[in-house]
A protein has these predicted regions:
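Charge-rich, solvent-exposed alpha-helical interaction surfaces
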Residues: 19, 23-27, 43, 47, ...
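Detector for intrinsically disordered, low-structure N-terminal pre-sequences
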Residues: 10, 44, 89, 107-109
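Short helix-coil junctions and helix-kink-helix linkers
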Residues: 42-73
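Long, low-complexity, charged/polar intrinsically disordered regions in eukaryotic proteins
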Residues: 1-37
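Short, cationic-aromatic polyanion-contact patches
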Residues: 93-111
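Surface-exposed polar/charged interaction patches
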Residues: 26, 30, 34, 47-51, ...
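A short, conserved structural fragment
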Residues: 83-93
């Protein structure tokens, strides 16, 4: 008998740092101009679930699309490298033409 647990906890993504770099690179290639940390997090979690890169994926269905704090730090470190290499910059303020989430950070891809 299989038992499925439902969880609203942050999703424990199990990408290595190198795998996470690839996932973020793939996402940035699809971005036309700007993105939010929230949108990137959604993409990473959705992809991790599809690829089986989530702890307890076989027995847990997550209703959250937030990453764990440790995964968020890895993503932040990778984004910092993109900023340092002038491939992405932080966009301060709000954009009325995009979805805005409280305490979210927007980024612009340098083309």
């Amino acid at each position: 008998m299989n038992i499925t647990y439902y969880s609203s906890n942050p999703v424990p993504v199990e990408y290595s740092e190198e795998e996470m770099k690839k996932v973020i690179s793939d996402y940035l290639r699809s971005v036309k101009e700007e993105f939010s940390f929230h949108a990137l997090s959604d993409y990473i979690v959705d992809r991790a679930i599809k690829e089986g890169k989530v702890a307890n994926a076989a027995s847990t269905q997550y209703s959250s699309n937030k990453m764990t704090p440790s995964s968020s730090i890895i993503v932040s470190k990778i984004l910092w490298n993109y900023i340092w290499n002038q491939k992405v910059f932080i966009a301060f303020g709000e954009n009325p033409y995009t979805a805005n989430y409280k305490d979210d950070t927007r980024f612009v891809v340098v083309k």
